[in-house]
């Protein structure tokens, strides 16, 4: 019985996924994921990326955000990306495969950043979802806290942070924490984000010294 329900649910998800206009556009444009459009919307409203910037991309695979940012920062820019999953190479992207929660992976990532002045940290990280908010939300909040810790370590004064967050327990406290570190903070729900999803994007600019 459970198997049948799961099968029906999977079928509905696949039908929704492939009929999604952003999925279709991504396929036509040869993009790695529909996430490309989310970041494009954020860039149109918040102008985060400029030529020559150094950007850290957390939760990068399959590469939609890195693929987008390469077009914005140009050949003199640099992207340092990390994900637990493998990612096909992108010119201009230094990719590290590993679990961001692992201290050794974090250390390796910081070594790759080195003395670079990072202007943007972006995180599209999400845990494997169980479908139970009481389990999923704390897991997701742990990841976004780690992303904010990365900001504290590498983000230059005046820099920006964009992070996917799932609304639920801990969201308001996290938002307050970000407001204490940045001069301007917005919560965005891009049109390309599925309406039924709890996800929103916090866009924080002007990191305080």
UniProtKB/Swiss-Prot annotation:
Q: Where in the cell is it found?
A: Cytoplasm
One annotated Gene Ontology cellular component of this protein: cytosol
Result of altering residue 32 to A: 4-fold decrease in activity and increase in Km for 50S subunit
Which factors induce or repress this protein, as stated in its UniProt record? Answer: By heat shock.
Q: What is the effect of changing residue 34 to A?
A: 4-fold decrease in activity and increase in Km for 50S subunit
Q: List the disulfide bonds.
A: none
Q: Does the keyword Cytoplasm apply?
A: yes
Q: What is its EC number?
A: 2.1.1.166
Result of mutating residue 22 to A?
No change in activity
The positions annotated for binding S-adenosyl-L-methionine are: 63, 65, 83, 99, 124
Alphabetical keyword list: Cytoplasm, Methyltransferase, rRNA processing, S-adenosyl-L-methionine, Stress response, Transferase
Q: Which family does it belong to?
A: Belongs to the methyltransferase superfamily. RlmE family.
Stated role: Specifically methylates the uridine in position 2552 of 23S rRNA at the 2'-O position of the ribose in the fully assembled 50S ribosomal subunit.
HAMAP family named among the record's database cross-references: RNA_methyltr_E
Q: What is this protein called?
A: Ribosomal RNA large subunit methyltransferase E
Q: Which organism is it from?
A: Escherichia coli (strain K12)
Organism lineage reads as: Bacteria, Pseudomonadati, Pseudomonadota, Gammaproteobacteria, Enterobacterales
């Amino acid at each position: 019985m459970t198997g049948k329900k799961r099968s029906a649910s999977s079928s509905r998800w696949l039908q929704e996924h492939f009929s999604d206009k952003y999925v279709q556009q991504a396929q036509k444009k040869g993009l790695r994921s529909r996430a490309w459009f989310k970041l494009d919307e954020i860039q149109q409203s918040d102008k985060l990326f400029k030529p020559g910037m150094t950007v850290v991309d957390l939760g990068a695979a399959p590469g939609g955000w890195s693929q987008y940012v390469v077009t914005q920062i140009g050949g003199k820019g640099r992207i340092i990306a990390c994900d637990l999953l493998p990612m096909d190479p992108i010119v201009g992207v230094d990719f590290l495969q590993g679990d961001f929660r692992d201290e050794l992976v974090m250390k390796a990532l910081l070594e790759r950043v080195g003395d670079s002045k990072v202007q943007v940290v972006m995180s599209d990280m999400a845990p494997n979802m169980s479908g139970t908010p009481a389990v999923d939300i704390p897991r997701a909040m742990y990841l976004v806290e780690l992303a904010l810790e990365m900001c504290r370590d590498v983000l230059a004064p005046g820099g920006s942070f964009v992070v996917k967050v799932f609304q639920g327990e801990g969201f308001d406290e996290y938002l307050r924490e970000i407001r204490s570190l940045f001069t301007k903070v917005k919560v965005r729900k891009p049109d390309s984000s599925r309406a039924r999803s709890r996800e929103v994007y916090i866009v924080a600019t002007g990191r305080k010294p």
